[in-house]
């Protein structure tokens, strides 16, 4: 979509740059040509539709972020990390884990949330 828009704008820009100098008054032919160019370019400039489609039966997954922070922990010797020392103990005692997990919601809970939202909208 962006490529089409860029090509269309490049064509219009090159046509404007290479046109002969025109008089101060625009005649009917120039107005019609400008309107035609605008009609061609306008559909390309509208935003593209989102392709976020959910089909029933597919699994819903989302990134789940887990932060492990063992700074100041003295319960055990931290021997999990095998890499080089960073120079600061605080940096070596933290970890961030990102994992895609299936998100499941019970149908009855979803129904209750929907009804609650609809009731809230009706009351306004």
From Swiss-Prot:
Chain residues that bind mesobiliverdin: 73, 81, 97
PTM entry text: Contains one phycocyanobilin chromophore and one mesobiliverdin chromophore with binding mediated by both the alpha and beta subunits.
Cysteines engaged in disulfide bonds, as pairs: none
Binding-site residues for (2R,3E)-phycocyanobilin, renumbered to this chain: 71
Compartments, record wording: Plastid, Chloroplast thylakoid membrane
Location, primary (coarse class): plastid
Annotated Gene Ontology cellular component terms: chloroplast thylakoid membrane; phycobilisome
Keyword terms of this UniProt record: Bile pigment, Chloroplast, Chromophore, Electron transport, Membrane, Photosynthesis, Plastid, Thylakoid, Transport
Keyword Nucleotide-binding in record: no
InterPro entries per record: Globular_prot_asu/bsu, Phycoerythr-like_a_sf, Phycoerythr_a
BP GO annotations: photosynthesis
Summary of the function given for this chain in its UniProt record: Light-harvesting photosynthetic tetrapyrrole chromophore-protein from the phycobiliprotein complex.
Note: The light-harvesting system in Cryptophytes contains phycobiliprotein complexes. Unusually they are composed of either phycoerythrin (CPE) or phycocyanin (CPC) but never allophycocyanin (APC), with only one type of biliprotein being present in any one species. Unlike cyanobacteria or red algae these proteins are not arranged into higher-order phycobilisome complexes, and they are found in the thylakoid lumen.
Name of this chain's protein: Phycocyanin PC645 alpha-3 subunit
Organism: Chroomonas sp. (strain CCMP270)
């Amino acid at each position: 979509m962006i490529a089409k828009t860029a090509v269309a704008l490049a064509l219009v820009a090159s046509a404007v740059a290479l046109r002969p100098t025109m008089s101060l008054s625009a005649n009917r032919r120039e107005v019609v040509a400008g309107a035609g160019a605008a009609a061609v370019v306008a559909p390309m400039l509208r935003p593209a539709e989102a392709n976020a489609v959910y089909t029933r039966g597919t699994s819903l997954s989302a990134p789940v972020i887990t932060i492990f922070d063992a700074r100041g922990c003295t319960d055990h010797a931290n021997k999990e990390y095998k890499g080089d020392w960073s120079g600061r103990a605080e940096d070596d005692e933290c970890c961030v884990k990102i994992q895609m997990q299936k998100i499941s919601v019970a149908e009855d809970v979803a129904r209750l949330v929907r009804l609650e939202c609809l009731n809230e909208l009706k009351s306004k």
